[in-house]
UniProtKB/Swiss-Prot annotation:
GO terms for molecular function: guanosine phosphorylase activity; purine-nucleoside phosphorylase activity; thymidine phosphorylase activity; uridine phosphorylase activity. Pfam families: Ppnp (PF06865). The keyword Transferase applies. This is Pyrimidine/purine nucleoside phosphorylase 1. The keyword DNA repair does not apply. Its EC number is 2.4.2.1, 2.4.2.2. It comes from Psychrobacter cryohalolentis (strain ATCC BAA-1226 / DSM 17306 / VKM B-2378 / K5). Belongs to the nucleoside phosphorylase PpnP family. One of its GO terms (cellular component) is cytosol. It is an enzyme of class 2 (transferase). InterPro entries: Ppnp, RmlC-like_jellyroll, RmlC_Cupin_sf. It catalyses: a purine D-ribonucleoside + phosphate = a purine nucleobase + alpha-D-ribose 1-phosphate; adenosine + phosphate = alpha-D-ribose 1-phosphate + adenine; cytidine + phosphate = cytosine + alpha-D-ribose 1-phosphate; guanosine + phosphate = alpha-D-ribose 1-phosphate + guanine. Catalyzes the phosphorolysis of diverse nucleosides, yielding D-ribose 1-phosphate and the respective free bases. Can use uridine, adenosine, guanosine, cytidine, thymidine, inosine and xanthosine as substrates. Also catalyzes the reverse reactions.
């Protein structure tokens, strides 16, 4: 279940912005040292067929609104995800994401 809000966190006010502003996220830090990012991805179009994101640590990406297709490095085909679903990407890897609508997500940094 998606948490609608987080309490007792510190928010990094400086956003991470990529793809000319089409993707942005903010990092939140919990008192116990855990980190998560909350982000928004705008739809792909004729200028951006898909987005590619690299991972340094294992990540579980939870889709909180919208729908998208994801192809994790090493996989042959894209898989479909929608709000309420998540996927895991190992550390030192990456994934492609394509979408026709705005996607919001929580990235749980697990490594």
């Amino acid at each position: 279940m998606t948490a609608a809000q987080f309490t007792n966190v510190t928010v990094n006010a400086q956003a991470t912005i990529s793809y000319d502003g089409r993707c942005s996220s903010h990092t939140i830090m919990f008192e116990d040292g855990r980190h998560k990012t909350l982000g928004v991805i705008l739809p792909c179009d004729n200028l951006v067929e898909h987005y590619h994101f690299s991972t340094n640590t294992s990540e579980r990406i939870e889709i909180t609104s919208g729908e998208c297709e994801v192809k994790i490095n090493g996989e042959e085909e894209f898989s479909y995800y929608r709000a309420g679903q998540s996927f895991v990407v190992e550390g030192n890897s990456g994934f492609n994401l394509r979408t026709e609508q705005i996607v919001q997500y929580i990235c749980h940094l697990e490594g």
